[in-house]
């Protein structure tokens, strides 16, 4: 579909069809949504600022969409996971109510796939919140956990 949209709109074109297919369902998880962007954060003030900002909420270009989907397919291939440095520390973090990560289940599945591939140091933590966990009200907890994870791995 990206290829067809690229023919129609070009590499730097923006496709409403692709945007709706990729992001359109996210808000459906929140029946009380007030804006098309409520899936981003549970804090209404953050969502209001995001919605009002002309630099936020733009549809991705067709080229970016295609590359993002290609990257997702690439990392999901078991052979590619096997090539990763097994000693590399990996910390998966996500919002428990993030529809992008299937309400945390997709993130836990990704962490499990890394472990199954033999990665030796994989941590996964879900936080209360939606997609932008660094903009949620308890964001300091996320920052503290990320800092603690990296401090444990500094030589």
Residue ranges and their predicted role:
Residues 115-155:
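Catalytic active-site module of serine/aspartate enzymes centered on a nucleophile-bearing elbow/loop
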Residues 1-55:
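Alpha/beta-hydrolase-fold enzymes
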Residues 96-99, 129-130:
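Acidic beta-to-alpha connecting loop that harbors the catalytic carboxylate
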Residues 60-82:
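Active-site nucleophile elbow and catalytic-triad environment of alpha/beta-hydrolase enzymes
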Residues 67-70, 109, 141, 145:
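Alpha-helical elements of Rossmann-like donor-binding domains used by nucleotide-donor carbohydrate transfer enzymes
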Residues 99-109:
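Conserved alpha/beta-hydrolase "acid-adjacent" motif
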Residues 92-94:
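Short beta-strand/loop motif that positions the catalytic acidic residue
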Residues 81-86, 117-119:
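Short, conserved loop/helix-junction motifs that constitute active-site signature segments
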């Amino acid at each position: 579909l990206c290829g067809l949209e690229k023919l129609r709109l070009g590499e730097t074109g923006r496709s409403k069809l692709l945007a709706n297919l990729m992001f359109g369902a996210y808000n459906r998880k929140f029946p009380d949504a007030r804006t098309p962007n409520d899936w981003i954060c549970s804090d209404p003030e953050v969502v209001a600022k995001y919605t009002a900002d002309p630099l936020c909420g733009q549809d991705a270009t067709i080229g970016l969409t295609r590359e993002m989907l290609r990257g997702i397919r690439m990392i999901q291939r078991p052979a590619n996971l096997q090539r990763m440095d097994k000693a590399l520390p990996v910390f998966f973090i996500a919002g428990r109510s993030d529809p992008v990560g299937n309400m945390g289940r997709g993130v836990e599945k990704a962490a499990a796939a890394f472990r199954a591939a033999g990665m030796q140091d994989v941590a996964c933590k879900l936080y209360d919140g939606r997609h932008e966990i660094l903009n949620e009200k308890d964001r300091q907890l996320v920052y503290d956990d990320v800092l603690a994870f990296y401090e444990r791995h500094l030589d």
